[in-house]
Swiss-Prot record:
Pfam families registered for this protein in UniProt: Ribosomal_L22
GO process terms (BP): translation
Lineage start: Bacteria, Bacillati, Mycoplasmatota, Mycoplasmoidales, Metamycoplasmataceae
Recorded superkingdom: Bacteria
Family statement drawn from the similarity comment of this UniProt entry: Belongs to the universal ribosomal protein uL22 family.
Function as written in the Swiss-Prot or TrEMBL entry: This protein binds specifically to 23S rRNA; its binding is stimulated by other ribosomal proteins, e.g. L4, L17, and L20. It is important during the early stages of 50S assembly. It makes multiple contacts with different domains of the 23S rRNA in the assembled 50S subunit and ribosome.
InterPro entries documented for this protein: Ribosomal_uL22 (IPR001063), Ribosomal_uL22_bac/chlpt-type (IPR005727), Ribosomal_uL22_bac/org-type (IPR047867), Ribosomal_uL22_sf (IPR036394)
Species of the source: Metamycoplasma hominis (strain ATCC 23114 / DSM 25592 / NBRC 14850 / NCTC 10111 / PG21) (Mycoplasma hominis)
This protein's UniProt keywords: Ribonucleoprotein, Ribosomal protein, RNA-binding, rRNA-binding
Protein name: Large ribosomal subunit protein uL22
Subunit text: Part of the 50S ribosomal subunit.
Length: 129
């Protein structure tokens, strides 16, 4: 959320999801700069835990765009999707000789921004960076 929210856009976020950010970013990279309808198809055919979380988040952002901002759902594109580190739960696994090995249960914060774009070449310029 480093940049300001645009006028013709809508966003949604979810926090404290029990998935490693590194694994979730693999799925997030698949839908960045894609249309919302194309992103839904990609997420439904991706067999990863993160795809379910991001699909719910994308549907929420589409609902925010249509109901709150009054945008056209067919012209929405994923302009920003972020997966950041959340708090880490630290657990210990007993090991030999009285030792304990640390297990880090990582969590993630997700943020998605959809922008209504009439000219498709605008999004292609952003995707070429």
């Amino acid at each position: 959320m480093a940049k300001e929210i645009l006028q013709n856009s809508a966003h949604a976020s979810v926090r404290m999801q029990r998935i490693s950010p590194r694994k979730a970013r693999l799925v997030a990279d698949l839908i960045r700069y894609k249309s919302a309808t194309q992103a839904i198809v990609i997420l439904k055919h991706t067999h990863k835990k993160a795809s379910e979380i991001i699909l719910k988040l994308l549907n929420s952002a589409i609902a925010n765009a249509t109901n709150n901002a009054g945008l056209d759902a067919t012209k929405l594109y994923v302009t920003t999707i972020l997966v950041n580190d959340g708090p880490t739960l630290k657990r210990f696994q007993p090991h030999s000789r009285g030792r304990a090995y640390a297990i880090l249960k990582r969590t993630s914060h997700f943020f998605i921004e959809l922008t209504e774009i009439n000219n498709v070449e605008e999004i292609n310029k952003k995707g070429d960076k």
